[in-house]
Amino acid sequence: SITSPYTPSEITEAIIKVLHANTFRCDVSIRVTLFVDGEGGWSSSNPVNMFIAPIAKPRSDINLENGKKGMISSFERINDHSMPPRAKVGANYINSRYAYLEAQSLSFDFPIMLDRMGKVSESSGSCLMMLRDGVLVTPPNTASIVESITRNTLLELSKKFNHTTEVRSVDKAELYLADEIFLCGTS
């Protein structure tokens, strides 16, 4: 694992400097990446470095009145037997990319990936939540999802406003019975 030598305030300050230097006039996704480089390849013990990549993300599809079309992907979500899915590392997103490209090639807007047990996991780069009979339901961390600050915030806000929430395994058949399905993520 990599331990950050940077404090949260140092990272925040660096992000602000990068944003000011680039003068964006649209929504921006900020990728903060920690890495180790140098001789020794995988076993390198050189200092941890950081780079910040601001990526313009214009929101042309913000009008969601008619909804979006999702599909159950043929790509299984990675699991702890191969790579820890809870880790926010670049390599873990390749699995989601394949699922997304498959969905796009079949004229769907997004994939829904299942875990090793055939239970609902997540979409590509987004956690999945559903409303069913007034209850907000989302798969647990053990369903091969990326642990998400946004997902946790939505669960906390739902509880704060006295909405019933359930974090539990979700069968794919339940998606067809849901009142609403939505994706959540930071970018």
Residue ranges, per PLM feature:
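Helix-start/capping segments and mature chain N-termini
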Residues: 1-17, 21, 35, 41-187
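Ordered, amphipathic secondary-structure segments that act as subunit-interaction surfaces
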Residues: 24-34
